[in-house]
Amino acid sequence: VGALRDFPGCAVMSMVRPRGGDFLYSTDDLAVMEADVRHAKAAGADGVVFGLLEAGGEVDLASCTHLARLCAELQLDFTFHRAVDASCDPVQAVVSLARAGFRRVLTSGGHARAVDGAGTIRAMVDAVKGTGLRVMVGSGVRPDNVVRLLRETGAHEAHGSCRTEVQSAFRHRPAVSFSASGSDYTRHETDTEQVRALVAAAAAIPRPSSGKA
């Protein structure tokens, strides 16, 4: 986070997620998340990204509100991440998040790729008109589909990894592996040209307002 602060004009949002797997968190998990929010602030982050659900798939409003209030006290922006795509009803989830004071949610419309969830994303956008909650479309967003996605969904923002696979220059191949998944000898890096193309494509179309009165 500190290194990223050296790039002017680039807002830094830190992911707050204590473990992999689902988004049903224990009291201990929540305590770790609270500490991570404070650490993100101390490191210079502009905001944090988190998401918590109940066992039945509803938004965990009590825990989310607790973290949101902490963020407000620390003057940190906060976004609800793609946990919304694992919720039992993404449309109702964003309505709940808007009422809880969230100003941004990242979603693929409950599908692996945003292009497949475009209809649900549109319903989510329509459901929170006038609340100030901004819907950010993400997952599989590329320079060649970002315009269509923003137009079809009415989403206010887009998120893309713009990543490319890079081969390692490490020639020795030991018999052990240290990767949880995939190969030890490939990694993903951000592709600068993809980023430029994505930004240019998105900037070329009129932006919808947040709908806040």
Provide a role label for each language-model segment.
Residues D46-L61, D77-C88, A93-V94, R103-V115, ...:
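Catalytic beta/alpha-barrel core
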Residues V16-G20, E54, V84, H111, ...:
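Short, flexible active-site-adjacent loop segments at beta-strand->alpha-helix junctions, enriched
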Residues V1-G20, V59-R82, A118-P143, A180-P208:
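Alpha-helix-loop-beta-strand connector modules within alpha/beta enzyme cores
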Residues V1-A62:
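Active-site beta->alpha loop and helix N-cap motifs at the rims of alpha/beta catalytic domains
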Residues L149-A213:
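Long hydrophobic alpha-helical segments typical of transmembrane helices together
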Residues D22, G57, S87-C88, A114-V115, ...:
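Generic structural signal for helix capping and beta-alpha/helix-loop junctions
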Residues H39-A55, F102-V115, T153-V176, Y185:
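Glycine-rich phosphate-binding active-site loops on the catalytic face of alpha/beta enzymes
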